[in-house]
Design a protein with these regions (language model features):
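Bacterial N-terminal signal peptides that target proteins for export
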Residues: 1-11
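Lectin-like carbohydrate-binding module/patch detector with strong preference for beta-trefoil
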Residues: 24-181
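N-terminal signal peptide c-region/cleavage motif recognized by signal peptidases
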Residues: 19-21
Length: 181
């Protein structure tokens, strides 16, 4: 390999690293996180339905020490992350429904090479939270929270805007991912 080619590869690698959102660079894959929104506050965390017609869909629930509220972020090597829970394990990833009654709502499914499972974490313009988007729907659709109705407190992707339901806080816990370095 020529020196020019080595230099070009090194520069490309550096540029890829620099283009990764600053917040994404600080995710520690060895620990679980809890997720909350500015809209509902720190006392409500993202959790997973266990059973029934909404099995594996997500919702905000009061903060508890339950495995469905512990989220793991695993980098894909391109600045995106797969999200899984302690509850369902690393084989079930957060994905987005494409169509139907639950269109644009996140749910846990078997992990695979699906762009709905590739999540971007972008620091908000104000710097007081992060926005969560997927490669599937693109940077113009942000994870927000239903306010009222049958889906109250459940997340869904909507057009990004200046809404506190789209400003998420990722709180690192002291719970280590088993087998993580």
């Amino acid at each position: 390999m020529t020196n020019s080619l080595r230099l070009l590869r090194a520069v490309a690698g550096l540029l890829a690293w620099l283009s990764t959102p600053v917040f994404a660079q600080s995710i520690d894959p060895s620990f679980y996180y809890k997720l909350s929104t500015q809209f509902r506050g720190d006392g409500m965390k993202l959790d997973v339905f266990n059973g029934g017609p909404k099995n594996n869909l997500t919702r905000l629930e009061p903060d508890q020490d339950v495995s469905g509220q512990f989220w793991r972020f695993v980098g894909n090597g391109d600045g995106t992350f797969r999200l899984s829970t302690l509850f369902r394990g690393p084989g079930m990833c957060l994905d987005i429904f494409n169509g139907g009654a639950n269109n644009n709502q996140p749910h846990l499914v078997r992990c695979g090479n699906f762009t709905g499972q590739f999540w971007n974490i972008m620091v908000s313009e104000s710097g007081d939270g992060v926005r969560l988007t997927t490669r599937f729907r693109g940077p113009g659709m942000c994870l927000d929270i239903f306010n009222g109705g049958v889906n109250d407190n459940q997340p869904h992707l909507v057009n990004c805007g200046n809404l506190t339901g789209q400003l998420w806080t990722l709180t690192k816990t002291d719970k280590r991912v088993e087998g993580a370095p």
